[in-house]
Regions:
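Short pre-active-site segment immediately N-terminal to the catalytic Zn-binding motif
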Residues: 299-303, 424-442
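Sec-exported extracytoplasmic/periplasmic mature domains
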Residues: 312-323, 351, 447-448, 452, ...
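Positively charged n-region of N-terminal signal peptides that target proteins for export
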Residues: 1-4
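Zn2+-dependent metallopeptidase catalytic core
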Residues: 64, 298-326
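Conserved catalytic/binding loops enriched for acidic/polar residues
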Residues: 428-429, 433, 459-789
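The catalytic-center signature of Zn2+-dependent metalloproteases
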Residues: 331-350, 436-490
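Bacterial N-terminal signal peptides
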Residues: 7-16
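Auxiliary tRNA-acceptor-end handling modules of aminoacyl-tRNA synthetases
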Residues: 24-299, 317, 331-429
Length: 789
């Protein structure tokens, strides 16, 4: 009897345990775990647990790749820091991998791959290089093939790297404060092909840097929003296109270990949007799906229209490539989220100081396909151009009212409602010039998001061949007066059409695409489509005479003389009429600075002919080198002409600021110590320092002449052809202009001459002491210094 009772007890115990286990297992189902939670259905279902402030993520696609993108919907507002509204962060191809009760978010290594149908060959490459596990999730519940994870910590972390960005900018040591951070549900949404999650993060620090103190209301607590996008990757219908250095289309680079031994292992594919003809056989066809860009509705008029118009110029280039109505620009709908990857965006971004605009993209790292174009345009750019214009041509009477009307807010013509006035584009209208610049800037940054790189040679041919150059305002001189009528161009240029054709042209069915692309390239180079980009234009010792930033014209030396004359005329008429009534006179300095240095970029362009080397990104073709003109040292006479033009800018009469202007600029007015204005270096504070201003202008000429790379080239080119000047000849000319000419009789001019002499010696000493300079360069510089003793 006891034995029977014991057996019965054991059976009942087992049954109860099984029942409890079954109930527990039922409780671990997704349905049970998410009961009462708000569900956001879509690509990856989300569940919002309002009571606990948690966000749960449902996963059913394992080992299936998708795109993970981080961005910054709100910014800090300081350009030097670089955390701007709308800024894109890292773009990663990732997948979920489950092991038991853990789910890993894995980033595969697409820099090294094997493009082959052999799975074992692909596996060998995958296992040879490390991958990255970005996050690990604990399974909260499961149901069939689906699992539920708590993604709160994943989304609430500093994924954009705000802490590290602040540290690199020397703005203090911050850390994420979870107690002051939360999900931003208004921008947390789900769609069939993308899941969007936004958070509000607060970073705290005890010793914030100056830039943080200037822009954040409570500098010890910096709050921004961070956005996460989980996006389905494009389907397999996209066809990559090879990168060619003869045309400036950016791309992705990777190593293909399955390539034949006779072929390069390095592969380069261009970045471009997916664009297909509706009728592939037609010369010009509507697209299957157009490329649509949306303009930030926060941009005011007339800026908004300028942004739309400038970006719309690209439709002309797409028409030249065989597409009709393929590129469109619209205003972002009020209910649309600009961080949604489905929208190509043109963002209007405010900062405390002026700074760069950007054209960036969300790209598929596997193919180079552009999924989202994202433009960031700094709002202070238009004000800077207005400052330049009103500094060159006085728009006010000496009493303070604008010529032809009453006094008004200086930027009223830009941000007021007088649309008819803004479209007049008169020869002296700084506002019209500023809006024209915004059109061009919109086109330029959108061009980057279409895949195009900078072309810093484009300003030298075909009357502004590309919007992808940096444009200086083309200020003309008509009847002795400055004229803004042609300050900035309209529309894309010949090079832009050439580049878009290479990137997007779709050839007739059955055509040999590689042969068609080569034919297109050879035709473009034959028509003079010269492309030279950043690496060959920006360095202080850059050699290409035609690759320059903020320059104009085919002849850099002639344009330097022109810009010096523009500067002379501007200074001759500079005075009270350059500022509106009610403005402190000390603010004249902010307008004087860009006028006084008006020639600086053209000077940098002209000096590149000294020790200059013309070259192209030529490649070998079946017919030989293309372009046929591979490289050519700038002619000796041309080098000397450029040198003389550069040295002319060092004459005291070129550096002096007229005393009548100095008399108008008192120390900084009370209440105007801060602001966005930019001013000269000053060693005579609080008084304006004309000697320091002259030193700054002189250094623009002296520094590049003694730059070590340029100096070494001069010696090398002289060895190849003694007719070319060597570095010693450049030094002799520099010293002759700054030290050996008779001292000016005027005391003011003489003081400037002495400042230039001192600067010359300082720069010579820098070069002589530069351990990276060639021995011959250091020796020549040392010899010159000794001769001055």
């Amino acid at each position: 009897m006891k034995r029977s009772l014991f057996v019965l007890f054991v059976v009942l115990l087992v049954l109860s345990l099984n029942t409890a286990a079954a109930a527990q297992e039922k409780d671990r189902s997704i349905r049970t775990r998410t009961k009462g939670l708000q569900k956001l259905d879509g690509y990856m279902p989300l569940y919002w647990d309002a009571e606990n402030g948690k966000l749960l993520l449902e996963i059913e696609r394992f080992n299936a790749e998708f795109l993970y993108q981080v961005s910054l919907p709100t910014g800090v507002g300081s350009n030097p820091i670089g955390l701007d509204r709308g800024q894109l962060g890292s773009t990663n191809v990732v997948f979920f991998e489950r092991t038991g009760q853990k789910v890993l978010l894995v980033r595969p290594n697409y820099r090294y791959r094997a493009i082959t149908n052999d799975p074992q060959e692909r596996r060998a490459v995958e296992e040879s290089f490390a991958r990255s596990v970005l996050w690990g999730f604990k399974v909260e519940a499961s149901e069939d093939a689906r699992v539920l994870v708590d993604a709160t910590a994943f989304f609430m972390r500093d994924a954009h790297g705000v802490v590290e960005t602040l540290r690199r900018a020397n703005q203090g040591r911050f850390q994420l404060d979870e107690s002051r951070s939360s999900f931003y549900l208004a921008r947390t949404k789900n769609f069939p092909q993308n899941t969007e999650v936004e958070t509000q993060l607060t970073f705290t620090g005890d010793e914030p840097g100056r830039l943080v103190r200037e822009t954040v209301p409570t500098p010890q607590a910096l709050t921004v929003r961070q956005h996460h996008s989980l996006v389905a990757l494009p389907d397999a219908g996209y066809k990559p296109r090879r990168l060619d250095p003869r045309v400036g289309v950016m791309g992705v680079e990777f190593y293909d270990y399955a390539s034949p031994i006779t072929e390069p292992i390095e592969q380069r594919w261009i970045n471009r949007h997916r664009l297909q003809k509706r009728d592939p056989a037609a010369a010009v066809s509507e697209p299957v799906k157009p490329i649509i860009y949306y303009v930030d509705s926060g941009a005011p008029e007339p800026i908004r229209r300028a942004l739309i118009e400038g970006a719309s110029w690209w439709n002309e280039a797409f028409e030249a490539a065989g597409f009709k109505n393929a590129f469109q620009v619209k205003l972002l709908p009020p209910d649309a989220d600009p961080m949604d990857v489905r929208y190509n965006m043109i963002n209007w971004v405010h900062r405390s100081t002026r700074g760069w605009s950007y054209g960036s993209s969300v790209e598929d790292p596997r193919t180079g396909e552009i999924i989202k174009g994202n433009v960031t345009l700094g709002s202070l750019r238009v004000r800077q151009d207005f400052l330049l214009g009103t500094g060159m041509i006085p728009p006010y009477t000496s009493g303070g009212a604008r010529h032809g009307g009453d006094a008004f807010c200086e930027l009223g013509m830009v941000f007021g409602g007088d649309d008819d006035y803004l479209t007049q584009n008169s020869s002296t209208d700084a506002a019209a010039m500023s809006v024209a610049r915004i059109r061009q800037l919109s086109a330029h940054e959108v061009g980057h998001t279409l895949g195009l790189a900078h072309n810093f040679a484009a300003s030298t041919y075909d009357g502004r061949a590309s919007v992808m150059d940096y444009p200086a305002p083309m200020v003309e001189i008509k009847n002795g007066k400055l004229d803004f009528s042609n300050a900035y161009g309209r529309g894309v240029g010949t090079y832009d059409k050439f580049a878009i054709r290479y990137a997007y042209a779709q050839f007739a069915p059955g055509a040999d695409e590689a042969a068609e692309l080569e034919r297109l390239l050879e035709d473009g180079t034959a028509r003079g489509m010269l492309f030279i980009s950043d690496a060959d234009a920006r360095p202080p010792g850059a050699a290409h005479p035609l690759a320059n930033l903020w320059d104009n014209g085919a002849d850099p030396v002639a344009m330097l003389r022109h810009e010096m004359e523009v500067r002379r005329i501007g200074l001759a008429q500079f005075g009270l009429a350059n500022i509106p009534r009610g403005t402190p006179l000390s603010m004249l300095e902010a307008k004087l600075l860009p006028l006084y240095l008006h020639h600086r970029y053209q000077l940098q362009a002209a000096v590149k002919s000294v020790g200059g080397l013309y070259y192209t990104y030529a490649v070998k073709t079946g017919a030989g080198a293309n372009p046929a003109r591979v490289q050519e040292i700038v002619a000796p006479a041309r080098q000397r002409e450029a040198l003389n033009a550069v040295l002319d800018t060092l004459r005291p009469e070129s550096l002096v600021i007229p005393p009548r202007i100095l008399a108008l600029i008192p120390p900084r007015a009370f209440g105007y110590e801060g602001g966005t204005g930019e001013y000269f270096e000053n060693r005579a504070d609080p008084a304006f320092d004309p000697i320091a201003a002259a030193t700054v202008a002189a250094d623009i000429a002296i520094l590049p002449l003694v730059e070590p790379h340029r100096a070494a080239r001069l010696n090398g080119f002289h060895a190849l052809n003694p007719a070319n000047p060597d570095f010693k000849q450049i030094l002799d000319a520099l010293v002759g202009r700054t030290w050996l000419e008779p001292a000016p009789r005027d005391a003011y001019h003489a003081a400037i001459a002495r400042a230039v002499q001192s600067l010359t010696v300082t720069r010579l000493m820098d070069t002589a002491a530069n351990a990276d300079a060639a021995p011959q360069v250091r020796a020549a510089t040392t010899q010159t210094l000794r001769a001055l003793q």
